[in-house]
């Protein structure tokens, strides 16, 4: 025998007008905020990733791969100096 937890059934929640009034505003605004976050380039600044035109510089046209496991710090420093 199961008890009642006092919560509203999910079907009642998604069929209520109040739910759709709130979510018809919040869902599109979250989508627009995410689109603006990415399209303005703020995502690159926040997460520190290079922009698509910054992957290869004029001085360095090869892919910066770490090949020597024991001297990896020196390789990383040489790659970051050329940026």
Curated annotation (Swiss-Prot):
UniProt cross-references to HAMAP family, sorted A to Z: PSII_PsbE (MF_00642)
Classification via Pfam families: Cytochrom_B559 (PF00283), Cytochrom_B559a (PF00284)
Source lineage: Eukaryota, Viridiplantae, Streptophyta, Charophyceae, Charales
Keyword terms of this UniProt record: Chloroplast, Electron transport, Heme, Iron, Membrane, Metal-binding, Photosynthesis, Photosystem II, Plastid, Thylakoid, Transmembrane, Transmembrane helix, Transport
Similarity comment: family membership: Belongs to the PsbE/PsbF family.
Top-rank lineage group of the source organism: Eukaryota
Name of the featured protein: Cytochrome b559 subunit alpha
Function: This b-type cytochrome is tightly associated with the reaction center of photosystem II (PSII). PSII is a light-driven water:plastoquinone oxidoreductase that uses light energy to abstract electrons from H(2)O, generating O(2) and a proton gradient subsequently used for ATP formation. It consists of a core antenna complex that captures photons, and an electron transfer chain that converts photonic excitation into a charge separation.
Topology in the lipid bilayer: Single-pass membrane protein
Stored Gene3D superfamilies: Photosystem II cytochrome b559, alpha subunit
Species this protein is from: Chara vulgaris
């Amino acid at each position: 025998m199961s008890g009642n937890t006092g919560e509203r059934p999910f079907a009642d929640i998604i069929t209520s007008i109040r739910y759709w009034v709130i979510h018809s505003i919040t869902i599109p605004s979250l989508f627009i905020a995410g689109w603006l976050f990415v399209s303005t380039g703020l995502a690159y600044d926040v997460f520190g990733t290079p922009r698509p035109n910054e992957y290869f510089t004029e001085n360095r046209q090869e892919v910066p791969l770490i090949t020597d496991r024991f001297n990896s710090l020196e390789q990383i420093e040489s790659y970051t100096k050329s940026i």
